[in-house]
């Protein structure tokens, strides 16, 4: 089943199997209702889907300049825990790094989701580049208490 609202899918290894980005063409009257209908009415009814977790950011920042060719992009997703009341500051701070193309303030288990984008290449591999920016830069931000990084095995992005 193809869903027009699915903009990206990322194959992961670990606690989650797939991370998908959903978007609506027009601004819906009540986006939560449309999202609920999409997730419960279609995605959860797909064969082989056992469970879903839906993350809806309270606030987002994005960088306009993505790499030109989607087939050359590789991603890493960094879930960030911040000190009490510092989530928005951390969300803004991580946007200072060139590799961070999106930063989302979350309500729930993690405080911020940072999306890192790299040009594909094997030397050094993407997980190594992600580890370097996370451990040497992002995790050293004083208001961050913990990070969890997910590096997709494969990504499909609609343009």
Predicted features and spans:
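A compositional/biophysical signature of low hydrophobicity enriched in polar/charged and small residues
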Residues: 1-159
């Amino acid at each position: 089943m193809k869903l027009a609202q699915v903009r990206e899918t990322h194959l992961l290894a670990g606690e989650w199997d797939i991370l998908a980005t959903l978007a609506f063409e027009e601004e819906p009257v009540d986006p939560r209702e449309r999202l609920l209908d999409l997730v419960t009415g279609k995605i959860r009814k797909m064969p082989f889907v056992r469970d879903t977790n839906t993350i809806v950011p309270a606030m987002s920042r994005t960088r306009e300049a993505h790499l030109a060719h989607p087939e050359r992009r590789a991603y890493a997703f960094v879930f960030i825990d911040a000190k009490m009341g510092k989530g928005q500051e951390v969300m803004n701070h991580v946007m200072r790094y060139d590799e961070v193309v999106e930063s989302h303030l979350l309500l729930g288990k993690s405080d911020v989701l940072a999306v890192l984008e790299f040009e594909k290449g094997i030397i050094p591999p993407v997980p190594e580049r992600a580890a370097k920016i996370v451990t040497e830069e992002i995790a050293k931000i004083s208001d961050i208490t913990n990070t969890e990084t997910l590096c997709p095995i494969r990504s499909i992005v609609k343009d």
